[in-house]
Amino acid sequence: MSRIGKMPIPLSNQAKIEINDSIIRVSGPKGSLEQKLTDQVIITEENSALLVRRIDDSKKARAQHGLYRMLINNMVQGVTNGFTTKLEIAGVGFRAEMKGELLALTLGFSHLIYFKAPEGIKLETPDQVTVLISGIDKALVGQVAAKIRSFKKPEPYRGKGIKYSGEVIRRKEGKAAGK
């Protein structure tokens, strides 16, 4: 049995769950999310918690068991608390600022990079070297953070670029000087 899949999903008073056919909809104070379910898992509600069970022990059902448990758990957490990812910008002259709904990044190129957040994602710049990405869909928050980071990944020699908060950049030594 999947160690992740067999754990119950705790439900708060704020989250409301609807299961229609093969679609689960979770709504809460921050918004609502829906996910299409596979026919390999069955969802039941017991003692203010959701349980995800698989229909048989086939390889496909075992693979889907833990996946759908975590997808539903992330939906419940997202509509009640939301998710936030923090990016840090390092480098001389590198900065970020909001221009209306667009994030304007100065990353050492000859032009500014403008990024428009998809619907459901909120971008903030508390200071010039920090970008906060928040939303209710964990996968979308991570995808947007990865997209922004891809504009200038941190390089190993000086550490310049955009990195996740808490990410450790493995540094390299430069070339040794010749005689």
Curated annotation (Swiss-Prot):
It comes from the Bacteria. Keywords: Ribonucleoprotein, Ribosomal protein, RNA-binding, rRNA-binding. One of its GO terms (molecular function) is rRNA binding. GO terms for biological process: cytoplasmic translation. It holds the Pfam family Ribosomal_L6. The keyword Cell cycle does not apply. The keyword rRNA-binding applies. GO terms for cellular component: cytosolic large ribosomal subunit. NCBIfam families: L6_bact. Belongs to the universal ribosomal protein uL6 family. Part of the 50S ribosomal subunit. This protein binds to the 23S rRNA, and is important in its secondary structure. It is located near the subunit interface in the base of the L7/L12 stalk, and near the tRNA binding site of the peptidyltransferase center. This is Large ribosomal subunit protein uL6. It comes from Chlorobium chlorochromatii (strain CaD3). The lineage of its organism: Bacteria, Pseudomonadati, Chlorobiota, Chlorobiia, Chlorobiales.
